[in-house]
Amino acid sequence: MRALTAFSRTKAGLGLLGGALAAGGVALVVAFSAGSAIDPVAAQDVTYFRIGAGTPGSAYYGIASQIAGIVSNPPGSRECDGEGACGVEGLLGLAQTTANPVDSIESLRGQSLEAAIVSADIADAALQGTGPFKKAGPMVDLRAIVNVGEVVLHIVVAKVSKAAGIKDLAGKKIAIGVADSENALTAKALLRAAGLPEKKIKAIDSETATAAAGLLTGEIDALVLVDEMPSTEIGALMASGNYRLLGAQLAGEDNPKYLFEEWIPAGKYPGVDSTRAIAVPSVLVARADLPGQIADGLVRALWHSAMPDASETAAGSIMPEMSRASVPWHPNAAAAFTELAKTAPALPETDAPTN
C-alpha cells in the first residue's frame, strides 16, 4: 500500500487516545486522563463533533470510534503538552450510528452530523449527485478532511468452483451483501471497475454467512466482501479450507482516479497465495462550512497520533495522495497538511492535497 493513513497507523499500535462507551446508538469517545472529570460550567463550551459511522460492528464504526477518541479534548480534560497531541481543544467526538453510507451523507447534508466516514466512491457519487444520490442531487459542499484507510475487494468462491478468474463470473449469481449496505454499494462500484457491471451478473442481496453457506450448496456462485485487509470474516472462511479467493484488476482506462490495485500478500489469509485486488480509500468527509480551526485541528490531531516517533513510515502514513481524492479538500485541512509536510522526515510517493 503506497499511501497509508492516520487511522491505519493508529491501528498498528501507535497510541490511541481514550476508549469508547456505547450508549443509545452513539459511541461516546472521550480523550482525557483516567479519574479526571469535566467541569459542568466548562462543559457548556464543548463542541460536539458527530461522525456518521455506519452500523455497529462495521469497519467504519470502528474507525469512527477511534478517530473520535483521537480528536477529543473537551473542556476540563488534561492539559495538552504538545500541538495536536491531545486532540482538538474543546471538541468532543461522537461516533454516530447510521443505517448505511447514504444515510451518513444525507445526515451530513441535513446538518445532523458534522462529519462522516465513507468510501471514496460514495463520496464521489454524493458530490456528483449520481447513483443513490440522484434524487437528492449533488452535495456540492462536500469536502475531504483526511483519508482514514482503505477497503479491498475480496471475491470468494467455493474451493471446488470451476471459476479461474473474475471473467468466469459473468452471468453468475454473486452475493454482494445486504441491500443498500456499505458493502453492497461499494461492491457494485468495484465489480464494475473490474469489468463486471451489475447488468452482467445476477446480484444477490445476502449476508456473508448466508452467502458462504450458499456457495457450498451451489445456490450462489461467488460472494463479495469489501473490507479492510486482513478481514476477520475472510480469514475465517479461508481457514475452513472450503473456499478460495479470485483475483481482480482494473479493466479499461476510464475508471475513477481514486480506485487502485492492491496485492493481498501470500499468507495474509490461511492457504491464500499472493492475489491481486482492487481497493478504494475510506475518507473522513465534512461540509465546506466546517470551521477552519476545527478542520486544521483534526488534521493535526490525526497527524500526531500517527507520528509519535516521527518515523519515515509514519510520515508517509498520514499524507493523502492527490491522485486519489474523490472530492475537494477542505482548504484548512489542505493547508495543515502542507505545513506539517515540511517537518516530516520523508514523504515518498505522496503529496500534500490541493484542490
Where are these regions (language model features)?
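A structural signal for short loop-to-beta-strand junctions that line the ligand-binding cleft
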Residues: 134-148, 153, 268-276
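Ligand-binding clefts/hinges and TM-proximal coupling segments of bilobed small-molecule sensing domains
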Residues: 171-189, 258-328
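Pocket-lining segment of extracytoplasmic ligand-binding domains
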Residues: 120-122, 129-131, 161, 197-285, ...
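Pocket-flanking alpha-helical
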Residues: 81-135, 155, 209-215, 220, ...
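Sec-exported extracytoplasmic/periplasmic mature domains
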Residues: 68-77, 109-113, 128, 192-196, ...
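An extracytoplasmic/periplasmic, membrane-proximal ligand-sensing/linker region
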Residues: 206, 210, 227-236, 245, ...
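N-terminal hydrophobic or amphipathic helices and topogenic motifs
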Residues: 2-7, 13-94, 103, 140, ...
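Bilobed "Venus flytrap"/periplasmic-binding protein-like clamshell domains
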Residues: 48-84, 147-217, 312-315, 319, ...
